[in-house]
Amino acid sequence: MAVTRTFSIIKPDATKRNLTGAVTKMLEEAGLRVVASKRIRMSREQAEGFYAVHKERPFFGELVDFMMSEPVVVQVLEGEDAVKRNRDVMGATNPAEAAEGTIRKEYALSIGENTVHGSDSEENAKIEIDFFFDEDEIVG
């Protein structure tokens, strides 16, 4: 397997509960390495731009407001088959359906407040990484 990169967000419900370290620990224990990380408060423009794919969905406004409600931690993760590895450790979007030992099973409050975002493909990972990071901010 090739070493690849993926993008992750530790969402407001997790940062509000001081879970950044616990979530990052689970990512690292899954074989992912944090090669870039920053804690930010997402602007409306950032949230709407990042989630533009959902613009026509009924939950779009609520999602944007949620992502602006508290700080988030945006990260670039690196590891073998990073996208799949990250999605496996995140668990299902609905925490009630997430496997034991996954981030969402352990920490998510609901489908909406589900602790983490992770890229769903290598192609989207690159787009999402480029949305928040300049190449010189990523230190492998």
From Swiss-Prot:
Subunit structure: Homotetramer.
EC number of the protein: 2.7.4.6
GO BP, sorted A to Z: CTP biosynthetic process; GTP biosynthetic process; UTP biosynthetic process
SMART domains: NDK
Record key words, sorted: ATP-binding, Cytoplasm, Kinase, Magnesium, Metal-binding, Nucleotide metabolism, Nucleotide-binding, Phosphoprotein, Transferase
Cofactor(s) required for function per UniProt: Mg(2+)
Chief localisation class: cytoplasm
Functional note: Major role in the synthesis of nucleoside triphosphates other than ATP. The ATP gamma phosphate is transferred to the NDP beta phosphate via a ping-pong mechanism, using a phosphorylated active-site intermediate.
Protein name: Nucleoside diphosphate kinase
Similarity field: Belongs to the NDK family.
SUPFAM superfamilies noted in UniProt: Nucleoside diphosphate kinase, NDK
Top-level taxon of the source organism: Bacteria
Pfam families recorded: NDK
Subcellular location: Cytoplasm
Catalytic activity as recorded in UniProt: a 2'-deoxyribonucleoside 5'-diphosphate + ATP = a 2'-deoxyribonucleoside 5'-triphosphate + ADP; a ribonucleoside 5'-diphosphate + ATP = a ribonucleoside 5'-triphosphate + ADP
Active site: H117 (pros-phosphohistidine intermediate)
Signal peptide region: none
Binding of ATP, residues: K11, F59, R87, T93, R104, N114
Cellular-component GO terms for this entry: cytoplasm
Gene: ndk
Natural source organism: Erythrobacter litoralis (strain HTCC2594)
GO molecular function term, any single one: ATP binding
InterPro entries given in the database record: NDK-like_dom, NDK-like_dom_sf, Nucleoside_diP_kinase, Nucleoside_diP_kinase_AS
